Amino acid sequence: MSGIGWQTLSLSLALVLSILNKVAPHACPAQCSCSGSTVDCHGLALRIVPRNIPRNTERLDLNGNNITRITKTDFAGLRHLRILQLMENKISTIERGAFHDLKELERLRLNRNNLQLFPELLFLGTAKLYRLDLSENQIQAIPRKAFRGAVDIKNLQLDYNQISCIEDGAFRALRDLEVLTLNNNNITRLSVASFNHMPKLRTFRLHSNNLYCDCHLAWLSDWLRQRPRVGLYTQCMGPSHLRGHNVAEVQKREFVCSDEEEGHQSFMAPSCSVLHCPIACTCSNNIVDCRGKGLTEIPTNLPETITEIRLEQNSIRVIPPGAFSPYKKLRRLDLSNNQISELAPDAFQGLRSLNSLVLYGNKITELPKSLFEGLFSLQLLLLNANKINCLRVDAFQDLHNLNLLSLYDNKLQTVAKGTFSALRAIQTMHLAQNPFICDCHLKWLADYLHTNPIETSGARCTSPRRLANKRIGQIKSKKFRCSGTEDYRSKLSGDCFADLACPEKCRCEGTTVDCSNQKLNKIPDHIPQYTAELRLNNNEFTVLEATGIFKKLPQLRKINLSNNKITDIEEGAFEGASGVNEILLTSNRLENVQHKMFKGLESLKTLMLRSNRISCVGNDSFTGLGSVRLLSLYDNQITTVAPGAFGTLHSLSTLNLLANPFNCNCHLAWLGEWLRRKRIVTGNPRCQKPYFLKEIPIQDVAIQDFTCDDGNDDNSCSPLSRCPSECTCLDTVVRCSNKGLKVLPKGIPRDVTELYLDGNQFTLVP
C-alpha cells in the first residue's frame, strides 16, 4: 500500500474516532440497544425504567417488561421524546408529574397494564400528545381533570377497562378528538355534555357497557341518531324491557324514570371519588384504612378530601416525593410498623392541616433536610423505635405547635444545641434508649431539661464510663466534659452527612458522594471523610493520578469510575483505599493492566474492567489482589493470557472473560485446562483464532490443538520489538519495501501509522 493510501486511512480512522468521541456522552442504558435517537429496551424483563437514558432520545421502547411503577423522575429531562411505548408491562401506579418534562411527546401507549387509577393533571405538560392508548387496563374512573393540558389529543383509547364513572367535563378539553373508544367497560350513565364538544369525532365505540336507559340517557339516543356512523351497536342493558335494544332505536318516550327521579332530568355525572379507594383498603367518613394489607408502597390517587390515612403494619420501604401532597385536608397520618428506610425530603410537603404523624417502628436512619417543613399544625410526632443516628439542628424548626415528640429507642449519640428551640408548645419528650455520649457537646441538653422538665422517659448516658447509666436531667453541668476521643466521636455523630460541605458540582446524600456527569478530569478536593460510595462515572478522566486523596477517606467502600476515558492509572493512585471492596472501571480506554495500578486495594472484592481495550493479561497483572472474588474482563481485546495470571487471586469465585478475541495458539494452552479445573468462569469464552478453532469454547479445545504452527505465534503479552529486523523504522513509520518478503514480518509496532510493503513477494494480502 502506498504512503498516500496509509495516510488517507489514518486520517479516516482519526475522523471516525473523533465522531465516536462526540457521541460517547449519550451512553446507552445497560441491556438496551440505541440507534440514533431511538432507545430500544423492550422484552428485557426490566422491573424499573432504566437510568441514563440519553437526553436526545426521541423514541423509547419499554414494552414487554415487568415495570410496575412510573415515578416522577423516570423520564426527567427527556424533553425531545416524541414516542413512548409502555404497553404490556405490569404498571399499576403512575406518580403525579411523571410526564412533566415530555413537552414534545406525541404518542403514548400504556395499554395492557394494571392501571386502576391515574392522577389528575397527569398530562398537563404534554400539549403535543395526539395519540393515547390506555386500553386493556383496570381503570375504574375518569376524573374531571384526567386529560387537562392534553388539548391536542386526536386518538384516545379507553376500551377494555372497568370504567364505571366518568366525571362531568372529563373530555371537555379534547375538542380535536377524532377517535374515542369506551367499549367493553362498566359504564351505566353518561352526562348530557359528555361528547357535545367533539365536532371532529369520526370513530366512537360505546358498545359492551352496562348502559341503563332511563330518562337520564334519553339524550344519547338523539345524539347517536344525528351521527349514524358512530357508536354502532351501543345497546341498553337495563331496564329489563329495553335490554339488548340499540340505544339509537329506543324512542324518547321509552326513556323513563321513577316519579322521584323525574324531577331531576338534567343528570350530572357524579364525583368518582368513592372509586378512588384502593382495592385492599376501606374508605369511609374521609378515612382511608389500609392497616395490615401487605402493601409495599404508598397508594396513589386517593380521594383528595380525606382527613386520615392509616397505613400501619404493612411492608412499605420508601416514602416518595410528594407522596401525600394532594391531600390538603389530611389531619392524621399513621405509617407505624412498616419497613421504611427512605424518606423523600418533600414526602409531607403541603400538609398544613396535619396534626398527628406516626412513624414509629420503622428503619429510618436519618431525617432528610426540610422533612417537616411547613407542618405548622403538627401536635404529635412519634419517631420512636427507629434507627435515627443524627438530628439536624433545624429538623423541627416549623413545629411551633408540637406537644409530644418521641425519639425513644433510636441510635442518637448526641443532639446539637438549638435542635429543640423552635418547640415552643412542647409538653412531653421521650429520649430514653439512645446511646448518648454525655460530653461537653451535650451539656446544653442537661441545662435544657433542668429548665424544662418535659423528658418523661428517663434518658440516660451510655458513655463516658464515669457517667454511664446516669439520667441526663439529673447530672450537674460541670460533669459534661470532653476528652480528645470523645470530642471527635460526638462531633461526627451530631452532624448529619447531608449537612456537611459537598464538593462543587457534586451531590451528597447520606454516605454517597455523586460527582457523575460533571465533565471532571480529576477527583475533586475535600471529599467528606465518611464517604462510603464515590461516584465519578461519566466524566472526562484520562489518567487517574496518585494524589493521595483516598488516604483521607477511611470509610470508603465503593468507587465508580465507569464511562470515562482512562488510559492509565498511576502507581499509588489507590494508596490508602484499603477498605474499598468494589471498583468499577467499565467503559474506559485501558490497554493493559499492571499490579502497580491497584496498589493499596487489600480489601477489594469486585473489580469491573468491562469494555476497555486490554489486549493481554500478564502473570503479574493482579498481584496483591488476594481478596478479589469477582473479576470482569468482558468485552476487551484480549488475545492471550499469561500462565499464572490469576494465580494470585486466591479468593476468586467469578471470572468473566466473554467477548474477547482469544488466539488459541500454544501460548494459551494452559488456560483451557485451568478453566476446566477451576469452574469459576462465566459462560464459555471462545477462540477466535486460528480459523479451525473459531467459536469453540477454550475449555473444550484439546491440548494438542493449541499450536503455534503456520506463523500463528503471536503473543500480545511478550515485549514488542521496536522494529522488525527486516525493516527500518522512524517514529511511527515502518518501511519494509523491496525486502523479498513472503509473509508479514513479526514485531511491527502497534502504534504504526504508515507501513510500506511494496516490492515484495506476497501472494496473499497479509
UniProtKB/Swiss-Prot annotation:
One of its GO terms (biological process) is olfactory bulb development. Keywords: Chemotaxis, Developmental protein, Differentiation, Disulfide bond, Glycoprotein, Heparin-binding, Leucine-rich repeat, Neurogenesis, Repeat, Secreted, Signal. One of its GO terms (cellular component) is cell body. Residues 1-30 form the signal peptide. PROSITE patterns: LRR (PS51450). Glycans are attached at N66, N186, N560, N619. Residues 31-55, 268-304, 493-529, 714-750 form the LRRNT domain. The keyword Repeat applies. One of its GO terms (molecular function) is heparan sulfate proteoglycan binding. Residues 209-259, 434-484, 660-710 form the LRRCT domain. Homodimer. Binds ROBO1 and ROBO2 with high affinity. Interacts with GREM1. This is Slit homolog 2 protein. It comes from Rattus norvegicus (Rat). The lineage of its organism: Eukaryota, Metazoa, Chordata, Craniata, Vertebrata.
